[in-house]
């Protein structure tokens, strides 16, 4: 589950629908990414990061 992405989205006061519209994907895609059911392309990751004001490491790096 991508809690980091969800928290960053909530910190920007964006709904899944709003974020999806800004980056040009469906709300379902955002939901699947946040739930860990979809691995986005690097391009999509970069677009999400731009909108949320985060780096790829901030949102998608997993500490093991």
Regions inferred by a protein language model and the residue ranges of each:
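Short C-terminal boundary/hinge segments that cap the last helix of small helical domains
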Residues: 19, 53-64
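Short, Lys/Arg-enriched, disordered terminal segments
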Residues: 1-3, 64
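Recognition helix of helix-turn-helix/homeodomain-like DNA-binding domains
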Residues: 25-38
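Hydrophobic micro-packing sites on short alpha-helices
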Residues: 44-49, 59-60
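Short basic helix-loop element that most often maps to the first helix and adjoining turn
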Residues: 3-22
